[in-house]
Amino acid sequence: MDYFTLFGLPARYQLDTQALSLRFQDLQRQYHPDKFASGSLAEQLAAVQQSATINQAWQTLRHPLMRAEYLLSLHGFDLASEQHTVRDTAFLMEQLELREELDEIEQAKDEARLESFIKRVKKMFDTRHQLMVEQLDNEAWDAAADTVRKLRFLDKLRSSAEQLEEKLLDF
């Protein structure tokens, strides 16, 4: 059973996050291992396995990039373990330049420039994220998979910039 079905939700990117949360809480109560403590060993094991599946499904569906990757996996794109990389050389060059810029910001300990950099990367991420949503809505799986690969780069870059921000603010 796929995660969307487990949660009683349609298999699409855009979800009712409140319904997702409520269903998660309901499933947790229903399959919590403590509820099966007096049951047979097989029932206890099944409850533990079901609880683990519910938790994994929850983590996957609530995180936007993980949800997109999972939805794509249902359509034959295993982005989590694939060796396929981004082939857009302009995008890759841009990523290298952004990484170099982040390194320069770190060397200079330039908080103002870092703040501007983070805003710029967030805007790039948001623009590409909106494109991905449209591609998934239109079932343009190949294009969406490529966009998700690019979003991974931007997400890592954003995370690195935010870690640098914390580091600079701690001084």
UniProtKB/Swiss-Prot annotation:
InterPro entries reported for this sequence: DnaJ_domain, HscB, HscB_C_sf, HscB_oligo_C, J_dom_sf
Keyword terms of this UniProt record: Chaperone
GO MF entries: ATPase activator activity; protein-folding chaperone binding
Keyword Nucleotide-binding among record annotations: no
Keyword Chaperone among record annotations: yes
GO term, biological process aspect, one: protein complex oligomerization
J domain location: 2-74
Gene3D superfamilies: DnaJ domain, HscB, C-terminal domain
Any one GO cellular component localisation term in the record: iron-sulfur cluster transfer complex
Top-rank lineage group of the source organism: Bacteria
SUPFAM superfamilies reported in the protein's UniProt record: Chaperone J-domain (SSF46565), HSC20 (HSCB), C-terminal oligomerisation domain (SSF47144)
Subunit structure of this chain's protein: Interacts with HscA and stimulates its ATPase activity. Interacts with IscU.
Functional note: Co-chaperone involved in the maturation of iron-sulfur cluster-containing proteins. Seems to help targeting proteins to be folded toward HscA.
Xref: NCBIfam families: hscB, PRK05014.1
Family, similarity comment: Belongs to the HscB family.
Protein name: Co-chaperone protein HscB
Originating organism: Shigella flexneri
Gene: hscB
